[in-house]
Amino acid sequence: MLELGSINASFSARKTALVVVAVLATVPVGAQTIQAQAAVEHSASVSVTSATAAPSERPPVIDGRDDDPIWKTATAITGFRVFDPKEDGEPTFETEAKIGYDAQNLYIFTRMFDAHPDSIISLLSRRDVKTESEQIKIMIDSYHDRRTGYEFAVNPAGVKRDYYTYDDSREDITWDAVWDVATRIDSLGWTAEFRIPLSQIRYPKAAEHTFGIMITRDIVRTSERDSWPLYRRSKRGIASQFGDLTGLRGLGSPHRLEIAPYVVSKNVSVPRPDGFGRAQKQTVGGDLKYGVTSNLTLDATVNPDFGQVEADPAQLNLTAFETFLAEQRPFFLEGTGIFSFNGDASRMFYSRRIGRAPQLSGLVSDPNADIPATTPILGAAKLTGRLASGTSLGTLFAVTGRQAVGSTMIEPQTEYAVIRASQDFRNGESGVGTMVTLVNRQLDDAAAQRLRREAVSGGIDMRHRFGEGRYSLAGSLGASVVRGTAGAIDRTQRNAVHYYNRPDAGLPYDSSRTSISGTNLLLKADKVAGTLTYGASYERLSPGFETNDLGFLAQADQQTGQAYASIQSSQPRAFWRNASAQVYQVNQFTANGLPTTNFSELDLYTEFHNRMTLSVSTWADNVFTAYCDRCARGGPAVRATPDVNMLINLGADPRPMVVPTLAAIYTVGDFGRTTLWRVRPYVTVRSRSNLSWELGTRYQRNRNDTQWFGNLGAIGSDTTHYLFAHLDQELLSFTSRLNYTATTALSVQLYAEPFLTTGRYFRLRELASPRADRYEDRYRPFDMPTDAASFNVKQLHTSTVVRWEYRPGSTVFIVWTQGRDQEDRNEGSFAPTRDFRDLFGARPDNTVLVKASYWINF
């Protein structure tokens, strides 16, 4: 077992910076050495389907016409085949593509023949929004590593979508490049003419290049998807199935430099007991993107505005665990794949830790105090890329500023660093990698009693495919260490991630400790291709493993074993276009072997010929003996009772003007004493080709007979009362989005989510014999009023976003967000009409933001 107890994790901000700067400084030198090596040879098993790019002496005019000289000489790519719904079928209409290039750009002209051009579906939307529209997509593997690539897609209305592909099939939909495309609908069908600057993609330095390439076409009205070369859904991966693009000679290797300065004006009003608090702020910042080499890019940002366009979803968390929130900030979203560790992009690096809400705001007692929702990011930089040898590199460094209210620190200045490297072998079929994260906080005496001062985590991961890509092995070994005062480490030991103080845990709880270390082991084996797939995995998290300073970890002290099997019918049959069935078995234990969870699951999915979908999932929890080690929130483990669940999702044909969907779930447990049912209808209405409205509703009724209520007394003492109650909870929320697109460069989006949940606690009990076989013997009555613990929580989040790309890469955003909260009326009483009326009458907080950026390309 890997131990970190003797590792000195202490490091200062200066040392952190030096580590990152050293990496940034040395990698390009190594890159030049590696780039001089020959490109990786492909194995004989790789498809030889290829196309040749024609050199262009004069750049074509990007207008969607094929009257430029290059299109007269370039060889046409033909032979597109259907891959969905039928694999290797004959296409309804022909498709052709021609490819040219010069030292600065790739040029691609595509002709989508259609016998009925007046029936071509062409919908206008914001950039990167997928609609039920015709589409042509160009996928380019410029490293020719069969694992990564860039995707450029457009529909007949000229709406652009672009992605970065990694791990052979995963997509980073947030990647945005600056490129041109023009489309036209004519008597033969429609066309798309692309200009893709080589500065926007990455490739090794060489006299002659071979890129991987695939072109796909969607014909929505016939529910058909075609590709060249043929993409086989029965095989694992996408980039590994690309054809070859040859003939690329003399490509430039520019040291790309892009600068995007911006100005932001922000006005905030927040309700206070004595009125409204108002603040206005103007800031200036900028983003920089520099091509250190042809395949390494440095991104930097100074004084960034990292506002979220949509608010996080409203919810009331009654569990012991932190809520995971999705990242929506472009700087951190782009390049996510490089920082993924063994397929998990969050356990070691959860980017929302950077700029998080102040952690010590609860120390401020003044109700009129202005407490910011986020911590300012003073600056951030990252270096990412992939070398000719198959080495992927990613480093990130960020500094957030100190936040204080008066003399009370609510968030310290913090330095963050992430270093990730991985090496591919066997043309990407195998690989090993390593990752290290570092956090350092500048704490005063009060904050040092609550927050950890230093944190380091790291690990190695590996993957290996064999049997012509049908089978895979993967694994990782990680370790962590955190340091701080005895007070801060004691809080760490007692939080829900660890619960060292649980009386029957048998863990070495020590309130005088000033550090904790731990390890993580993961092993996986899978059959990943073919009609039948299956696999198994084992993971162990030691009690002291801790990554939450820069990662996301809900629970340590856990072993998980799981197995699954799946059968997929990818060819159309009499009753469906495609269908699948999966079975799962999962068992969890503490690190010391106490069984905590087991569940068995069956999932069924069908897509019918009319494009309707139906999925049904059913699972049973804790049919075998298990003990919940988190239910008593630091108390003893409680015998878990079985529950049975069913989830149904029904989706309509996505092509009509009105598209309804429905999801419903039902749960019964605690021998019928606990029930939950939830229904979520959703409808999308597209009244015009550029106007859509989405409305969703969620209603939930939860009767939980074993809801944790509280612990009275010192946790772990003989006199502690571990209290549980019956919770009767109702929840109602609405989600609405309105999208209007005036042009491909100008759009308006409105978002609103009113949220209401109420709950009453009754039948209060305390643990008596928590591991008793009989449910009735585990608890005994406890006499204490519960009325004060009832709740009525109401929230409203709205946002209006106007986005105008007034020139390529340059945008103006106008954003208005509003929030309303109310929790002090009608506790325990559920009356939606009354409650939403009260909510809309509550005083709002408002934020109006205007941001303008200007993209400069050198």
Residue ranges and their predicted role:
Residues 1-13:
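N-terminal secretory signal peptides that target proteins for export/translocation
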Residues 32-424, 429-434, 842-845:
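Structural preference for beta-rich elements and adjacent junctions enriched in aromatics
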Residues 376, 472-474, 478-858:
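Exposed, low-structure sequence patches enriched in small/polar residues
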